[in-house]
Amino acid sequence: MQVFNQVSDSAQMHKVAGLKGITILEAKAAASGQLDIVLAKTERGEYVTWVYVFGQFASGHYFANDIAQAANDYAERVS
């Protein structure tokens, strides 16, 4: 099992997001501890939940202007 440094991983996640014009609203390690679940707002104003793993955002669920649905999806993905 690969162990990640949570402090530098978080800094890297925010750096990657900033370069893409993404605002991270919340991020939390998934129950497995091997990846992070991210709630964010894209440069187009959409809300999205992503998996952040190995320095990349993946498996996005997009919600046009609906923070409530995105927050519910985030809560489900984190648990």
Q: What is the meaning of each model-derived region?
A:
Residues I22-L25, I37, S59, A64:
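Intrinsically disordered, low-complexity, compositionally biased regions/tails
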Residues L35-G60, E76-R77:
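Short aromatic-glycine-(Arg/Gly/Cys) micro-motifs in beta-strand/loop hairpins
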Residues M1-A30:
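Negatively charged, low-complexity tracts enriched in Asp/Glu with abundant Ser/Thr
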Residues S8-S10, S32, S59, S79:
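Generic serine detector
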Residues F63-S79:
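A short, charged, amphipathic alpha-helix used as a generic interaction element across diverse proteins
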